[in-house]
Every structure is written in structure tokens, then in C-alpha cells.
Swiss-Prot record:
It is found in: Mitochondrion; Membrane. It comes from Homo sapiens. Induction: Expression is low in quiescent cells and is induced in exponentially proliferating cultures. Expression is also induced when prolactin is added to stationary cells. Induced by dietary differentiating agents such as butyrate and retinoic acid. This is NADH dehydrogenase [ubiquinone] 1 alpha subcomplex assembly factor 4. One of its GO terms (cellular component) is cytosol. One of its GO terms (molecular function) is calmodulin binding. It comes from the Eukaryota. The modification Phosphoserine is found at residue 35.
Amino acid sequence: MGALVIRGIRNFNLENRAEREISKMKPSVAPRHPSTNSLLREQISLYPEVKGEIARKDEKLLSFLKDVYVDSKDPVSSLQVKAAETCQEPKEFRLPKDHHFDMINIKSIPKGKISIVEALTLLNNHKLFPETWTAEKIMQEYQLEQKDVNSLLKYFVTFEVEIFPPEDKKAIRSK
């Protein structure tokens, strides 16, 4: 139903719109520079047969053009072949530190990365024992870069649960 309406709107007044487009002034050629005009007039006056040659179609060349068939395929570049032959270097992996979260099956961790459990563990250790768990020790223990460890300790903190004593004596105490 929608296509019928759209077609009707599209074809409405089609002949008048086409006539209007046809009768519009066509864009004219950009004017030539005055020095170029004089040179062109001079060349045409010296060689009048050139003007006819430019306008004439050469049947021999047109027949050659019709016979041309181009079928091209890009050659496989040597860089692509070499890239396909070389295998990626194997990454270095390490085993996770703690296995007390067995529901997360992590077999190996790339060097320079840590799991979420390890991140929370090292943040908590650093918070509880900052003298023992320094950035250098964390860097060596988890095989991380110094700037990453410093950023981790600076911008990430673990949650703290604080229980405030009730101000009101009539508050219900938890059992």
C-alpha cells in the first residue's frame, strides 16, 4: 500500500518537471584566458585541418577499442606471502597465583596482565600491608610494568565496609 502512494507522489506532474529540467540553461564552458585565445586562433589559422581532425572519429581506432577486453587479477604481493609464512611468536604466559576461585576457569594469563581476582588481591594486600606489598614487589610478583603498577595503586581502591553505630538508643539491633 505504501509503495502505491509513493509511486503516485513520485509520478505526479512528471511531464512538467521533466520539461522544466530540459529547458533549464545548461552550464557553459569556463572562459579561456585571453592569452590562450590568441594562441589558439593563431594555431588554427596556421593549421586549419587540425580542427577537422579533432572533431572526426577514427573508425580504425574505435574498432581497436571495441576489440579490447581487459581481464585483470591483482598479483599476490611478496609481503602478503611472507606474512602468511611467518607465524606469530608464542606469547609468554604464567599460571594464576591463587586457585581458591575455581568457578573461574583461567588456565593461563599473558605476562604483563592480571586477572580481576589477582587485581583485587594485590590491591587489598597493598592496602592492609603497604610496607610489605610495595609497587616493586607487586611488579616482580605479577610480572607487570612499573608504570602500570603505579597507576593501579594510584587510581584503583578496594571497597571498604564501615558499620556506623546507631545514634538512637531505640534502634533495633541486629541479632
